Amino acid sequence: MLQHKILGLDVGSRTVGIAISDIMGWTAQGLDTLRINEENNELGIDQLVDIIKKHNVGTVVIGLPKNMNNSIGFRGEASLTYKEKLLEAYPSIEIVMWDERLSTMAAERSLLEADVSRQKRKQLIDKMAAVFILQGYLDSLH
């Protein structure tokens, strides 16, 4: 059993998908999607810190989008910046960067296979991508 839950994040330019682990650290469940505005530096960090405290989170896993050649592009740099902003606001939190290549595509495919409507997919995709990111990390622990 974990002492603290683990949060998974899929950071985009307009939304942050959030998933959370069960207390055993076996499964990831979608929790929420934060609306952000990266251009205006409105990153939802205060809301995220509230979620971390409310759910007794000890570790945050942030998806790190890499290019297929393993280099880090613009979105990857944005995720690393998000990590720094979160650490400034909450220095005691452990943050793990997790290779998230293809997680959004996998989430989209699973929603398509579940026959979820296009409108509903748009609402769920970021949260589902966060679930894929966190589940990958949890699986690596066991």
Swiss-Prot record:
The keyword Nuclease applies. Could be a nuclease involved in processing of the 5'-end of pre-16S rRNA. InterPro entries: RNaseH-like_sf, YqgF, YqgF/RNaseH-like_dom, YqgF/RNaseH-like_dom_sf. SMART domains: YqgFc. The lineage of its organism: Bacteria, Bacillati, Bacillota, Bacilli, Bacillales. Keywords: Cytoplasm, Hydrolase, Nuclease, Ribosome biogenesis. Belongs to the YqgF nuclease family. It comes from the Bacteria. This is Putative pre-16S rRNA nuclease. It is found in: Cytoplasm. GO terms for cellular component: cytosol. The keyword Hydrolase applies. Its EC number is 3.1.-.-. PANTHER family: POLYNUCLEOTIDYL TRANSFERASE, RIBONUCLEASE H-LIKE SUPERFAMILY PROTEIN. One of its GO terms (molecular function) is nuclease activity. It comes from Staphylococcus aureus (strain bovine RF122 / ET3-1). It is an enzyme of class 3 (hydrolase). Signal peptide: none annotated. It holds the Pfam family RuvX. GO terms for biological process: rRNA 5'-end processing.
